[in-house]
Design a protein with these regions (language model features):
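Alpha-helix C-terminal capping segments
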Residues: 47, 93-107, 187-192, 224-228, ...
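Short beta-strand segments
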Residues: 109, 143, 151-154, 199-203, ...
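Active-site cofactor/substrate anionic-group-binding motifs, chiefly glycine-
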Residues: 49-110, 114
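Phosphate/diphosphate-binding glycine-rich loops and adjacent basic-rich segments that engage nucleotide
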Residues: 144-193
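A glycine-rich helix N-cap at a beta->alpha junction
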Residues: 123-149, 219-225, 229
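N-terminal glycine-rich anion-binding loops that anchor highly charged ligand groups
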Residues: 1, 10-73
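Short glycine/serine/threonine-rich phosphate/pyrophosphate-binding segments
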Residues: 87-96, 100-101, 108-109, 115-118, ...
Length: 434
């Protein structure tokens, strides 16, 4: 088999076979196919596309390029959740303890943040003492014992995807939907769960800006998962404005704790309740969405979800006094309120640019080596469609460097718009696919 022939075949719009795809991924991962040939194939895929079989075989070849986690020692139906990422996306922090408190085992691997999107691991590690570095045995034992564990992704998980993604990043081949679907699903399938819930974001702060693209991506990922024998549900959700009120690691952890105490912002609560209900259906704990919703609300109101979060934090070395008393968390030195200069309504908040505000303050990574400041970020007081009077606080900026705070305030004002007429409130849940 020659890589030249595969490039030519795909350039002509012909489908690659299972054997060809497996050979290509194996040879590339082992360093026997050069980047220039793989780049040529990726560009041919961008122009000619992949059919369902090719997308599935590419996903499985990448999943099998490294360790495939075996979670069979964990009792029950293991349900994983993946978000395509956004700004203020602290979903896993509140969602996982809720479903774990209702008996669904959560054995989750999460990543760090890069660019304007924050990572679950960074947020958890802002809790003093919390460790995400676990051995496989300890990870499994913890899930069997308390129904929940979240650990950092290991380097052995889908190494072919890591190599391909780095190449796609520098060859303008990132945004091909089948390549995105196979990249995400290769890691999810390698992580060993029985069922997967996908939270596919759409809007200005999402990877998929257009809703039609988000739906197409969700459909392809659901198809791949089902072909691999997994139970699948995808929920298309809004990311035109930041999720909840807080953006920044410690600020988001505090908001997740508030939500588990029953005091979360409306949009975040709606998202959490919806995703948790679908996870309960996937895990076989409830018959339908309404029953799931009732049980999720009970878990929060009774304090079971918060207790489970504390149990989870303690099991991974975290200090639970910060959960009981979030005011103990370290706070930024500079706190600056941004006030409205006019009456009206909040017309739009560019989610991606608000993520950039957090990045300017030091709350994100410019490169993989960047060190994050967990104390910085912003907390909104007014969201889209809220009425505003002149002098009202729109948001509060948290920073540790006066120059960076000035830049962030300027950037905020350029991307937060007040209008005279009340706009329509954004719809959080756009569509559910399974």
């Amino acid at each position: 088999m020659r890589m030249y022939d595969l490039i030519l075949k795909k350039r002509q719009g012909k489908p690659l076979t299972k054997d060809e795809i497996q050979w290509m991924i194996r040879e590339y991962t082992d360093g026997r196919i050069p980047d220039y040939q793989m780049s040529a194939l990726l560009m041919a895929i961008c122009f000619q596309g992949l059919d369902k079989e090719e997308t599935y075989e590419l996903t499985m070849a990448m999943a099998r390029s490294g360790e495939m986690l075996d979670l069979s020692q964990i009792q029950g139906i293991k349900v994983d959740k993946h978000s395509t990422g956004g700004v203020g996306d602290k979903t896993s922090l509140a969602l996982t303890p809720i479903v774990a408190s209702l008996g669904i085992p959560v054995a989750k691997m999460s990543g760090r943040g890069l660019g304007h999107t924050g990572g679950t691991i960074d947020k958890l590690e802002s809790i003093p003492g919390f460790s995400t570095q676990l051995e496989d045995d300890a990870f499994e034992e913890q899930v069997n014992s308390i129904c929940i564990s979240i650990m950092g992704q290991t380097k052995d998980l889908a190494p072919a995807d890591k190599l391909l993604y780095a190449l796609r990043d520098v060859t303008a081949t990132v945004d091909q939907i089948s390549l995105i679907a196979s990249s995400i699903m290769s890691k999810k399938l390698a992580a060993g769960a029985d069922a997967i819930l996908l939270d596919v974001k759409t809007g200005s702060g999402a990877f998929m800006k257009e809703e039609s693209d988000a739906i197409q991506l969700a459909k392809e990922m659901v198809e791949i998962g089902k072909s691999a024998g997994r139970k699948m549900t995808a929920v298309i959700t809004n990311m035109d404005e930041p999720l909840g009120m807080a953006v920044g690691n410690i600020l988001e952890v505090k908001e997740a704790i508030d939500t588990l105490k029953g005091n979360g912002p409306d949009d975040f609560v709606e998202l959490i309740e919806t995703l948790a209900s679908h996870m309960l259906i996937l895990g076989g704990a409830v018959k339908d969405f309404d029953e799931g919703l009732m049980r999720v609300r009970e878990s929060i109101q009774s304090g079971k979800a918060l207790d489970k979060f504390k149990q989870f934090v303690a099991a991974q070395g975290g200090d639970t006094k910060y959960i009981d008393h979030p005011e103990l968390f370290e706070q930024a030195d500079i706190i600056e309120e941004i006030r409205s200069e006019q009456d009206g309504f909040v017309g739009s908040i560019d989610a991606q640019e608000m993520g950039i505000c957090s990045l300017i303050l030091g709350g994100g990574r410019e490169t993989k080596e960047s060190v994050i400041d967990p104390t910085v970020g912003l907390v909104f007081s007014k969201k889209v469609a809220d009425p505003v009077k002149k002098g009202d606080v729109l948001a509060t900026i948290y920073g540790n460097d006066e120059e960076k705070v000035k830049q962030a305030v300027l950037h905020f004002k350029e991307n937060y718009h007040i209008i005279e007429e009340k706009p329509t409130k954004p719809i959080m849940i756009r569509e559910v696919l399974s």
